[in-house]
A protein has these predicted regions:
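Conserved class I S-adenosyl-L-methionine
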Residues: 232-241
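Class I SAM-dependent methyltransferase SAM/SAH-binding core
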Residues: 252-276
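Conserved beta-strand signature within the Rossmann-like core of class I S-adenosyl-L-methionine
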Residues: 318-330
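Active-site beta-strand->loop->alpha-helix modules in alpha/beta enzyme cores, enriched
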Residues: 1-116
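The feature marks non-catalytic terminal segments
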Residues: 2, 43-54, 65-71, 113-195
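Conserved alpha-helix/loop element of class I SAM-dependent methyltransferases that forms part
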Residues: 212-230
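Conserved SAM-binding loop of SAM-dependent methyltransferases across substrates and taxa
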Residues: 242-252
Length: 382
């Protein structure tokens, strides 16, 4: 059996797959996604020699390094396999380094039905249930550290979050898991909250099945209704995603204008709530720039995480704004702004859901959900 190790950059083979390279009885092929290079390590070659052969492929930091796509990777995999038995090792689709996560997803799609094992890799937010754990002995760890110190010094010094090498990214135990197509896609989408890839699957944050999310949403609806009953006028929900909150509000009797700029999310929102809510494509910035959608209140529920200027609220055509955020983000962003602004006052603050640990992606991983605090802002005469 040929071991095919598909990585973004050459150093990844030593950092995340040293235990694979150490299986000297197997022929091992390393595929570098950023350059398309293929390194063949014959069976019987000791680990030290294999690392020496890998070292010249280590490149300078390149922020443009990216997966070449499943089609290009499939060609490399087929060349390496040569029609014989092979297994593929690659990055986790949920690797926090998105360049690696994308390559891991693409490589699995390129495997052609061969067995695939994903390295857990860099995962500061998720704890994984792995299928194969390989603790390195002291000699293995020493070999990994020596490779980094000799050939990756620039990666120890770089400011690039995608490519920097730190203690937590140099694993003494290499952990791997197998995943089917749906699980891979859900893992990839879960870590994509800041980009368009979050919409590649339905319900990426598992609102429909999460007890934590159900409690948060139900409590949020009750909180809104306690201050702004359904007959108060329409609500404008900004960043409605697929409508988990929208449908609850409609069921409570509210008239809802739900806005969602992501086309895929908006399509699902319309399918789920379009018969009962009015759907709009504007972002918060667009709503503030052209305040043509008045409401009894605006809802900014779990969406001020992406660097938006809180000053945009000044231009929204409503005197009440409901905001919900996790406690740390609330303390770091909204609270200081609220202390400075003369235009808004805090009319209410209450916990909506307590922090909890929860399994995700069918139990493949779990994470800490940090709780949510609701803050009602009322416009002042300032």
């Amino acid at each position: 059996v040929i071991d095919i190790v598909a990585v973004l950059r050459a150093e990844d083979a030593a950092l995340d797959f040293l235990s694979v390279l150490g299986e000297e009885q197997h022929e091992t092929h390393i595929l570098c996604g950023d350059t398309g290079e293929r390194l063949v390590l014959p069976a019987g070659r000791p680990l030290a020699d294999r690392l020496d052969a890998l070292a010249p492929l280590v490149r300078p930091v390149d922020e443009d390094a990216a997966s070449p796509g499943a089609e290009a990777l499939a060609a490399l995999v087929e060349t390496s396999a040569g029609g014989g038995p092979a297994r593929l090792w690659t990055h986790s689709p949920a690797d926090t380094r998105r360049s690696r996560g994308r390559l891991g997803r693409d490589a699995a799609d390129a495997a052609g039905g061969r067995p695939v094992l994903h390295a857990v890799g860099h995962s500061p937010y998720l704890q994984f249930i792995s299928d194969l754990d390989r603790p390195l002995d002291r000699a293995g760890v020493a070999a990994k550290l020596a490779f980094v110190n000799r050939h990756c010094g620039h990666l120890l010094r770089t400011a690039s979050e995608e490519h920097v090498v730190r203690t937590g990214r140099v694993h003494a135990t290499e952990r791997f898991f197998a995943a089917g197509p749906e699980e891979r896609e859900r893992l990839f989408a879960l870590l994509a909250s800041l980009d368009e890839d979050a919409a590649t699957v339905d319900d990426p944050w598992e609102f429909a099945t999460s007890a934590y999310e159900a409690e948060r949403l139900d409590t949020t609806v009750a909180w809104i209704a306690s201050h702004c009953p359904p007959d108060s006028g329409p609500l404008v929900e900004v960043g409605a995603c697929e409508g988990a909150l929208t449908t609850r509000l409609v069921d409570k009797g509210f008239t809802v204008h739900a806005t969602e700029p992501n086309a895929a999310f908006r399509h699902r929102l319309a399918a789920r709530a379009g018969g009962a809510a009015r759907i709009h494509p504007e972002s918060l910035e667009e709503l503030a720039a052209r305040p043509a959608l008045p409401g009894a209140a605006y809802l900014l529920i779990e969406m001020l995480y992406y660097g938006q200027d809180p000053g945009l609220l000044d231009r929204l055509p409503a005197d009440l704004v409901f905001v919900a955020l996790e406690p740390e983000t609330l303390a770091a962003t909204l609270t200081p702004w609220l202390q400075r602004t003369p235009h808004w006052e805090k009319a209410d603050e209450r916990p909506l859901v307590a922090p909890a640990l929860e399994a995700v992606c069918g139990g493949r991983a779990y994470l800490s959900k940090r709780g949510s605090i609701g803050v009602l802002l009322r416009r002042t005469g300032g």
